[in-house]
Amino acid sequence: MTNELQARVVRKLTWRILPFVMLLYFVSFLDRVNVGFAALTMNKDLGLSPTMFGLGGGIFFLGYFLFEVPSNLILNKVGARIWIARVMVTWGLVSAASAFVVGPNSFYTLRFLLGVAEAGFFPGIILYLSQWFPARQRAVAAAAFMAAAPLSTAIGSPISGAIMQMPALFGLKDWQWLFIIEAIPAVVLRFVVLKALTDSPEKATWLAADEKAWLVATLREERAGRESQAGHAAGALAALRDPRVWIMSMIYFGTSAGLYTLGLWAPLIIRQFGFSALGTGALNAIPSVLAVIGMVLWARHSDRTGERTWHVVLPCIAAGIGLAWAGFADTIVAVVLALIFVNVGISAAKAPLWAMPSSFLSGAGAAAGIAMINSIGNLGGFVGPFAIGWLKSVTGGYAAGLYVVAASLAVSAMLTLAIGRRGYRTAPAPQ
C-alpha cells in the first residue's frame, strides 16, 4: 500500500508542479540568453567590440551574485508563490527595457539590472522542489525543471532567428523587437504564478488526506536527519561556513562557464560560417534537443542507482572535450557535433549535481546554501563569456577562450571526484 501511495503522490506532484516550473524556467533562460541572437545585428548598431559584448553578456551574473542569497532567504520567509511572482514581473520589465539601450554603458547597466531582477529564481525553484519531492525522486524532478534550459534553446533559437529577420517596425530594429516580444511572457506569467503555485505540502488542497499525510511525514523524516535546533540565522550561517557548499560552488562555476559561453556565443560562432539568422537558429537548436533527452535519461539513471559523483564527473569531461573540439573545428558539421558534446554534457551534469546539496542541507541552511552555490557558481557565467570576448579581441579567434572554459570543466570534474569521496549517494528509487 505504501509503494502504491508513494507512486500516486509522486505522479500528482510531477504533473501538478513540474510542467509549470519548466515553463517559468523556459521563459527565464530565454530572456537571459537571447542577447546572443540580438548580437547578430545589435553589436554593430551599438558599436560593441567582442570584449564589450562578452563583458555586457556576463555582467548579468554580477547582479545575480550580489542579490542571490538575500533573495532566497526572503523566499524561504514569504513563500515561493509571492516571491517568484515578484521576480518574474521585475525581470520581464527589465528585459523589455533592454530594447532601448543606446551604447556600451546602458547595455552594461541593463544586463546588470536583469541579473538583480532574476536573482533568486533558479535556486528558489530548486529549494521549492526540495520542499515537495522526496530525496529519491529529487534528481529526476530537478532534471525535468532544468531540461527547460536546453528546451528553451531548442525552441527559442528558431523563434529568435525568425524575429531577427523582421524589418524595422515603428522605428524599432529587429534586435529591439526580440527583447520586447520575448519579455512579454514573463510579465503575463506573474499573474499565473499567484494562482498556480502552492507554498507547501501542508497547504495542498489538491492532495487527498492520506497523500498529504504521507508526503508531509516523509519530508519531515528526511529533514530530521539534517536539521539541528539552531534558529533561522544560525542555520544559514552554518551552511555558508560549510566547506562542501564552497566546493560545490566551484564545481557549478565550471558548468556555468560552459553553459553561458554556449548561450551567448554559439549563435555568433555558427553565424561565421555564413548562415542567416534563421539558419543560425535552426542549427543552434539541434544540440539542445539532444541535451533535453540526455539530461532526463541520465538523471533517471542517477536516481535509479542512487549514485551522484560519476553522474557529474563524466558529463563534465564530455563537455570539456566538446569545447576543446569546437576550438579547432573548421567545418559547420564539426562545430555542431562539438556543441552536441557540450550541450549534452553540461545538461546531464546539472540534475545529479543539484540533487547533492539537499543531502546535507535543510531549512534556512538549504535556502542560504543552495543560493550561495548558485550565485558563486554562476559567476562562471560572467567569466566564461567575458574570456571568450576578450581573447577573441586579442587573438582574432574563438579557440583560446574555448580552451579556457574547457579547462574550467576539467577542474569541475576533479573537484566532484574529491568531494564525492564523502559519499554522495541516496537510496536507489524503488522500481
Question: Could you describe each region identified by the protein language model?
Answer:
Residues 47, 79, 100-106, 117, ...:
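Helix-breaking motifs and short loop linkers at transmembrane-helix boundaries and internal kinks
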Residues 66-105:
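Conserved MFS/SLC helix-loop-helix module at the cytosolic interface between two early adjacent transmembrane helices
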Residues 76-88, 303-316:
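Cytoplasmic membrane-interface "Motif A"-like loop-to-helix N-cap segments
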Residues 110-147:
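Cytoplasmic helix-loop-helix junction between adjacent transmembrane helices
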Residues 140-164, 185-186, 374-384:
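Glycine-rich segments within core transmembrane alpha-helices of 12-TM secondary carriers
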Residues 306-356:
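C-terminal transmembrane helical hairpin of 12-TM major facilitator-type secondary transporters
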